[in-house]
Design a protein with these regions (language model features):
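Hydrophobic/aromatic residues in alpha-helical transmembrane segments
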Residues: 48-52, 107-110
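Membrane-interface helix/loop boundary segments of multi-pass membrane proteins
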Residues: 1-13, 24-28, 53-61
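Residue-level signature of the transmembrane alpha-helical core
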Residues: 5-12, 38, 42, 46, ...
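Membrane-interface interhelical connector segments
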Residues: 19-33
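C-terminal membrane module of polytopic membrane proteins
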Residues: 28-29, 35-36, 70-124
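Short hydrophobic alpha-helical membrane-anchoring segments
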Residues: 12, 16, 20, 57-58, ...
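Kinked, hydrophobic transmembrane alpha-helices enriched for aromatic residues
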Residues: 10-22, 65-84
Length: 124
């Protein structure tokens, strides 16, 4: 858990310069900008990092999480390509897959899978 949490936070922080300078991910004029976006992005990265790590551990093939990461990026960009909302103020919350509301199921799955793994390790 500690490695996944640290990895997700570092991965999120890695994006911060572009988020602060050019509005990468959520734009520049959104609810709670820029602090809320930085925090939400770390939550998204923790959840995705955990799921990608589990994919790698179970398959022992780097291509599986790499393809899943690419698929997530493509899905995350799709609403931006297909829909141009008149008001981007709430982008940090949703409906984009990188919004907090959309990331909550991914976060729940990541936490549940991690807790399940921790229980299995305790039994062994």
């Amino acid at each position: 858990l500690n490695g996944r949490l640290l990895g997700g936070v570092v991965w999120g922080i890695w994006h911060w310069p572009l988020m602060l300078l050019v509005g990468y991910e959520y734009g520049t004029n959104y609810l709670g900008a820029p602090l809320l976006g930085l925090v939400v992005w770390c939550v998204v990265c923790f959840a995705l990092n955990t799921l990608l790590d589990i994919l790698y551990e179970r398959t022992e093939c780097i291509w599986v999480p790499a393809i899943a990461h690419g698929a997530f990026n493509a899905i995350a960009a799709l609403p931006q390509v297909l829909v141009t909302p008149a008001d981007t103020y709430y982008n940090v919350l949703g409906p984009m897959p990188i919004g907090l509301i959309s990331a909550l199921p991914m976060l729940a799955a990541a936490v549940w899978l991690t807790l399940r793994e921790m229980k299995q390790e305790e039994k062994n």
